[in-house]
Amino acid sequence: MDLSYFWFEEEDIFDLLNSTVGIEKESLRIDQDGSLSQHSHKHGGFGNRSFHPYIQTDFADVQLELVTPPSASADELSAWLQALHQISATAFEDDFIWPSSMPGQIPDDRDQIKIAQLEDPIEYNYRAHLVDTYGKDVQLISGIHFNLELNPKLVKSRCASWG
């Protein structure tokens, strides 16, 4: 397959507009002093990472990951993200959700930063490997990921045309 040409044609624009987007928003939970919260994710009533499909943890147990379902509408996506944020803020009533990507304070004792509590040993070992390779500090950097799903009908059509 030659990928040196445009994947889509002008007539594909309407099918492309029927693609969906999901968001994963990572944020640290902090206490009233601005330090990383010492409350576990379970403290908020969410159980382990696999318990709630939309409110999870990323690298650290204190690092929320709010995951929206795929949506074709910016308004729907925004409503999901706002609702997930509100639920999280309410569930962890003694914590605040840090708004910035970079952590405000990192404890001198890095052992206070707990890796997310995961049932799958492979996922936990991957995070432990990240600690060994990069350290915990860099793993606390939080951000937003956009997940784009191209309209499956269009992808199927294009793949069929490529043979």
Residue ranges of each PLM-predicted region?
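Long, contiguous juxta-domain segments that are non-catalytic but functionally important
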Residues: 1-48
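Short alpha-helical segments and helix-capping/turn motifs at coil-helix boundaries
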Residues: 6-14, 50, 84-85, 128-133
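Short, solvent-exposed loop/turn segments at the edges of secondary structure
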Residues: 22, 59, 139-143
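A generic structural motif
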Residues: 29-33, 68-77, 150-154
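Active-site acidic/histidine clusters and adjacent loop/turn architecture
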Residues: 40-118
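Short, charge-rich binding segments
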Residues: 89-92, 135-139
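Loop-rich catalytic cores of soluble enzymes, especially ATP-dependent carboxylate-amine ligases
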Residues: 106, 117-133, 140, 149-163
